Amino acid sequence: MLMKLHRVTYVVFLFFLGVYVLGNHLLPVSDPVESNYALTAKEMVLSGDWLSPQIYGHYWFDKPIMIYWLLSLSYSVFGMTDFASRFPSGLFGALSVAMVYQGVRTLTGQRVGSLLSAFILGTSLIVWTIAHGIITDMVLLFATVGTFYYAYRGLLVKNPWHMAVAYGFAGIAVLTKGPVGLVLPGLLFLIYAGVKRSWSMVKALFPWQGILVFLAVVLPWYGYMYHTHGMEFINGFLGLHNVTRATQSEHPEVNHWWYYLPIFLGGSLPWTGAILYGMYRGWKTRTDGYLYTMIMGWGTILFYTMMATKYPTYAFISVIPFSLLGAYGVISLKDASHRAWWWLLGPTLVLWWALGVGTFFAPWGFWWILRAVVVVLTLFLGGCYWYRKRLMMPFTVGMGTLVVLGIVLMEGLVPFLGLRSSVTYHEQVRSFHGPVYYYGEYAASVPYYLDVTPVRVEPSPERLAKYNVQRSAKWNGKNVMPQIEEQELFRRLQSGERMLIITNKNYGKELEESSVGQYLERDESSSKVVLLHSK
């Protein structure tokens, strides 16, 4: 029932683990997303309560428990460091790539196709990026790889115990992301069965063994949370963070039907062309495997397109079937015309040169190394094309991209995430003796790093409307940090309270020009943040 691991699987895992954790100790925890996970896990470790997530001392039902367990375990092993914060995503990224190799190898028996599938997944821009992040999506990717593989294998060999393992992985997904971890794969498999017009396949999707395994995985934690927190958990987790997210956009300004298409095209680089070519070539025969991957990939994108809230990583798991299609595309190129290889080379050069040219607009970093590497890689790849070294071309594309992205991490991501974090003004906050306020925006990285919990100030409706901040009032339920209204801040300023205000450039200018501007003095300003203190 379980896979016997091939020796190459271990090599794939270790290689990509090294790729994904390299340099993580240099990347600070960024705001506004990563810091919420890091702070919640920190409070879990410090409080000793490993079952009910908390943030700012309040119970927090934003996500299920899995990511907090993993981060807390990482902190327990490595300490509360930036490396520890990013280690779970790197670990599960490597596990996902290795499982794709193992799964494709077991299903097809083809070493080249298996290596290509894993290589394409592991070197895709969006996978590399998220494998360095502090979010839930890489753990979800791992769980989804297991669900997709074991469910498909269970349908092929008609073994309910394979399906039971798939349900176990779906349970991990539900502990990671919520009900969507079961609902989405279930819908996609029902669509696949419908396309195959197989009622027996529909019945095979619901074995009693699988349902028992799923309940055994998810019920202990979900049952505990309902028993302990009752309707507060139901309303917060299922209501606000699931139903509201699906029906009312958290970011209305990006709620477009085409939102995930550019993410697919850009996130799949450098393999976008190979994936599209695989789709094109596969359409002629439309084998079972082709139909399966197309339904899993495009079905995922369509599902999240229909949701009200759009977010760059929501359709992330579509990279699993698309990587298999990309491998099919690369293999098909060896029998195609020589010019067809531009399906692979074109998007690769777009990525490399976009990053190379982009360095001329970056205000930081020593970029001559990257520019030289891009030129050398381009010449080498051109030589492979000229001399028809068809095996070397995909290898050069993947390895070259990892080299380019490694330089971007060191020279670009480190300072960029610094600007997205509070680390650039830690010294001012640490040395200030008095209450600290965030006006409008909020950075959970301050309490994470400094054990100082600022008070959030909600701008007036007029100021929010001026900067086109429009979303349902229900989303205010996410703000569980200490907070006050704008008028209360003004009252405290006018009463002479000593305070430090952190805000963005727009709101900083608004405050300086408001009725309380005479009480404020600018302390420091950067491209992102303005610090104001009372006179």
Model regions and ranges:
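Membrane-integral, polyisoprenol-dependent glycosyltransferases
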Residues: M1-A340
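Membrane-embedded architecture of ER/inner-membrane glycosylation machinery
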Residues: A164, G278-K535
